[in-house]
A protein has these predicted regions:
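Soluble extramembrane regions of membrane proteins in the secretory/endomembrane system
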Residues: 1-264
C-alpha cells in the first residue's frame, strides 16, 4: 500500500498532505524516489527483496535496488497467471507491491516530459527557435543547404518535449496525464492534457508550408512554470505562474475550476 508518510527530520516519520507528495513526484522525481511511501507488512516479501524486517515503509529506491525490479516483474507475471483463490499470502503481498510500483511509475511519467530538465525554459526556447528549427528540419529532409546546429537543437527539443508513444498512451488512457488545459472561451471541447496540448500545438504549427510560428497554450506555459519553480524551490515564481494560470481560467469562462487552483507554495 502507498501512504503519504516518509522519514523527515532525523528519521522521525511524519505525514505530509497528499498534494505536497504529488507535487514532489511531478517536479522532483529524484527526491520522491527516496520517500518511504510504500507499506509492506509481509516478512517473506521483505526478505525476498532484501528489506529491513523491522521497517514497514519503503521507498521506490529501496524496493527496486539491485535486480529487485526485474524479480518483481517476473514474479508478478507468474502470480498473475495463477488463480486468485490459490495465491499464498506471500504471493498476494508481492503482487500488491508490484502493482503499486507500476501505478507509481505511470504517475511519475504523467506530469511532464521525462527528459525535461527545465520545463518552462525549454518551452520558451522552443517557441523562440521554432521558425528557424522548422526551416532547418524541412531543408534537412530534402537535402537542401541548412545549419545543422539549428536542426540538431530543434530535434533535441522535440525529443525532450514529446516522448514516443506518449500521445497514444494518453488517448488510450494508459497514462494518467491530468487534464489541466481548458478549452477556449467559445468552445465546448473537453479539457486536454499537457501532452495533448503540446502535441497539437506542434503538429498544427508544422502543417504550414512556410513562415512557421508556434503558439503554445498560455495554460501550458503557466503549468510548466509552476513545475519548474517548485523543482527549484522558488515560491514567488510558483505563485506568479499559478496566478497566471488562474487568470487564464477566469478569462476563458472556467470559474468553476478556480476553487481547485488556490494552493500557493
Amino acid at each position: 500500500k502507498s501512504t503519504g508518510r516518509y522519514a523527515r527530520n532525523g528519521g522521525e516519520e511524519e505525514t505530509i498532505p497528499a498534494i505536497e507528495w504529488l507535487l514532489e513526484l511531478a517536479a522532483k522525481p529524484e527526491t520522491a524516489r527516496t520517500r518511504p511511501v510504500f507499506r509492506i507488512d509481509n516478512e517473506e516479501v521483505k526478505d525476498n527483496l532484501g528489506l529491513d524486517n523491522s521497517e514497514k515503509h519503503f521507498s521506490v529506491n529501496d524496493i527496486t535496488t539491485g535486480n529487485n525490479f526485474e524479480r518483481l516483474a517476473r514474479e508478478s507475471g507468474r502470480i498473475h497467471s495463477k488463480e486468485t483463490s490459490l495465491r499464498t499470502p506471500y504471493e498476494k503481498s508481492l503482487k500488491s507491491v508490484a502493482d503499486s510500483l507500476l501505478i507509481y511509475q505511470r504517475l511519475a511519467k504523467s506530469f511532464r516530459p521525462q527528459r525535461s530538465v527545465d520545463f518552462a525554459g525549454e518551452l520558451k526556447q522552443f517557441e523562440e527557435i521554432f521558425p528557424i528549427g522548422m526551416a532547418a528540419a524541412r531543408a534537412h529532409e530534402t537535402g537542401a543547404e541548412h545549419d545543422e546546429e539549428d536542426h540538431d537543437q530543434f530535434s533535441g527539443l522535440i525529443d525532450t518535449l514529446i516522448e514516443p508513444g506518449a500521445h497514444e498512451g494518453d488517448r488510450g488512457g494508459v497514462m494518467f496525464w491530468p487534464r489541466v488545459i481548458p478549452p477556449g472561451n467559445d468552445s465546448d471541447a473537453d479539457w486536454r492534457s499537457l501532452n495533448s496540448s503540446l502535441f497539437h500545438s506542434i503538429t498544427n504549427a508544422a502543417a504550414a508550408d512556410r513562415d512557421w510560428k508556434i503558439e503554445i497554450d498560455p495554460a501550458a506555459k503557466a503549468y510548466a512554470g509552476m513545475l519548474t519553480a517548485y523543482k527549484n524551490d522558488k515560491p514567488e515564481e510558483f505563485n506568479s505562474a499559478l496566478a497566471g494560470y488562474r487568470d487564464y481560467l477566469d478569462k476563458n469562462g472556467q470559474n468553476a475550476a478556480l476553487g481547485k487552483t488556490g494552493k500557493e507554495f
